[in-house]
Amino acid sequence: MALLTPLFAFLYHLPQVYKWLLKPYYIASLFMSIAFVMIRKMPGVCEHLSTQREDGNSCDFDWREVEILMFLSAIVMMKNRRAITIEQHVGNIILFCKVANVILFFRLDIRLGLLYLTLCIVFLMTCKPPLYMGPEYIKYFSDKTIDEELEKDHRVTWIVEFFANWSPECQSFASVYADLSLKYNCAGLKFGKVDIGRYGEVSKKYRVSTSPLSKQLPSLVLFQGGKEVMRRPQVDKKGRAVSWTFTEENIIREFNLNELYQKSKKLGKTKEKLERPSELVFSTVPEEEEPEAETISAMDTESKKDK
């Protein structure tokens, strides 16, 4: 089952893979992930490499290299069992491929190992995964606007994500959160985000740690009447987050989004009734005046008869 899950996820999101091919980050990551295989199989280069094979064929993997690659495959499958999105699946594969490449290159030649490790460090410092740029109904807060928006209308329920741009978990969760905002956003239920990596005061006020060890990123907090009602993940006494998976199904269930959405839609309809244009009010005036006009004309005819 661990082998089929990433395969099905890859096939389901296959159309998105073509978009990645146009992004330099994934192209460079692909070449760095298969660097050792390319060098070991490249004609004109592989003949000059050392090998532990009995037949002396330096253009094929020896038994130790095969063991390392098999161990890598097992680690990737175990890690991907908890992956939510295709970005996380691909990110795990790229990460462990680079780790395996470092080990294989150092085992082959220490100079190649140092060169590859240097390339990985430079790549990590200069290239970042592309951010989610798809459609969404999300309001972005700053340290000055978040309190104002939460207190603006106590009838509005807010779901706010506390995130940091450098966090891989937040980057992977961005598309899931955007999809939820497209499905459930309405007049009485709104979605917001605040970058606590940028606004440290917000992080302290709402008790969301930016430390990677705390594992509190991302954090989803539900506000009703301007006050916090619940949050995920929960935090224990030591300040560490209780393990929780940020899937769309879990969020809908834990935050009762279907029920909140139905209640919020009723609030939106009430607002529309209260905010109707004045033209609708004026249109009722002639209907009320017509009976009065008929009464007046009837009284005039009666008075004429009396005369």
UniProtKB/Swiss-Prot annotation:
Residues 133-307 are cytoplasmic. Residues 268-307 are annotated as: Disordered. Residues 269-278 have a biased composition (Basic and acidic residues). It comes from the Eukaryota. One of its GO terms (biological process) is brain development. It is found in: Endoplasmic reticulum membrane; Mitochondrion membrane. CDD domains: TMX2 (cd02962). A motif (Di-lysine motif) lies at residues 304-307. The chain crosses the membrane at residues 112-132. GO terms for molecular function: disulfide oxidoreductase activity. Residues 1-19 form the signal peptide. It holds the Pfam family Thioredoxin. It is a single-pass type I membrane protein. Residues 20-111 are extracellular. Keywords: Disulfide bond, Endoplasmic reticulum, Membrane, Mitochondrion, Signal, Transmembrane, Transmembrane helix. GO terms for cellular component: endoplasmic reticulum membrane; mitochondria-associated endoplasmic reticulum membrane contact site; mitochondrial membrane; mitochondrion. Monomer. Homodimer; disulfide-linked. Occurs in both reduced and oxidized monomeric form. Oxidative conditions increase homodimerization. Endoplasmic reticulum and mitochondria-associated protein that probably functions as a regulator of cellular redox state and thereby regulates protein post-translational modification, protein folding and mitochondrial activity. The thioredoxin domain lacks the 2 redox-active cysteines, suggesting that it lacks thioredoxin activity. This is Thioredoxin-related transmembrane protein 2-B. It comes from Danio rerio (Zebrafish).
